[in-house]
């Protein structure tokens, strides 16, 4: 399995707008992408503007399909000015 973890820092004044966009992207990913098995959106309780994603795909090709999906492209465009930093890591689940 192919794992993606993402750490976001979100502008605090844009957090309320960002969260529903992210939650809809996560739901659409699991619902509409056969290769996406899990998409968890987590929030740091001590720093609510820090968002962590855990995504589980069949393989890299399934993740690439996610990046090309209409729901991801829409989310990416809508949230671009809300994000102050983003760190993405790809891992293989053992």
Predicted regions span which residues?
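Generic structural signal for individual residues within well-ordered alpha-helical segments
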Residues: 16-19, 64, 73
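Short phosphate-engaging motifs
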Residues: 14, 59, 71
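Short amphipathic alpha-helical segments
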Residues: 14-37
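Short, well-ordered beta-strand segments in beta-rich or mixed alpha/beta enzyme
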Residues: 2-9, 38-67
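Glycine-rich beta-strand-turn "strand-cap" elements at beta-sheet edges
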Residues: 40-49, 75-94
